[in-house]
Amino acid sequence: FIYSKDNQFSITTTPIANADFGLQSGPLLIKDQALMPLKIINDEGRRRVIATLTPQNQLIFITIVSKDSEFNGPLLAETPQVLEIIGQKINQDFDVAINLDGGSASAFYTPQTYIKEFSPIGSYFCY
């Protein structure tokens, strides 16, 4: 996940020379609007925090939780399919999506939504 000096966001596996900052994360969930097949050993249902880019290069952060608990969510291997369903429900295509974090040491704050961490977290990404 990269923010470049020309005010553009990128989610790529290729280094970008003019990056202002970047985050190492993964795995990629969607690439070139195609769902990525994931095989995860010891996969568990956890809250998922995802960064996506639309065809218009709009950055969207998505947090996926279960209906029963803010700390549970889909298996990581199921997350690309869950994103596809979300995209259909909100009528939005995703060019690319990457898993940022999830589980008990993740949080999500906006003026409308607050999902707190269960375990203390070491840092925040503010956008």
Q: PLM features: what roles do these ranges have?
A:
Residues 1-127:
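Gly/Ser/Thr/Pro-rich low-complexity, intrinsically disordered segments
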